[in-house]
């Protein structure tokens, strides 16, 4: 992202298509591709074992819960100034140089909707929690309806009040989804979340 989108770098002598920068970018891309292939290979080998473990269900649900909490707190609340010193700060978001922060948030929501939601709602329905399962489905739809209106760069969304209101709407929808999943669904499924489970420590 730095090589492609950093404004200061891309006004200097080493900006693309400078040969050394092209070489470095090619090496980085090949390294990322190699890591991705290696992760996929190892996951495919580990997957059958993982699916058979006693912890599979709880671990998977907690992973989805953690993703939602990180999305709500670190990727939205903190840069919006809703936590900490109360100042808006686009530079603590992912992909801020490229202006694609909110598209990465949409990708996270889409991934959870595609790969996490079906299993979660099936489990809830198995516990006679069909109403809760439907509420969660509907809330995912509410979150997704914020896009593409929320495609602005985070710096713009934080600086312009009309765009900030769009961002606030997205935050509220994600917060409501987090409550439904992390509080109500977790209780219904007897999934215990550890203290500070999304802190990464």
Cite the ranges covered by each PLM segment.
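Mature extracytoplasmic or organellar-lumen-exposed domains after removal of signal/transit peptides
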Residues: 1-201
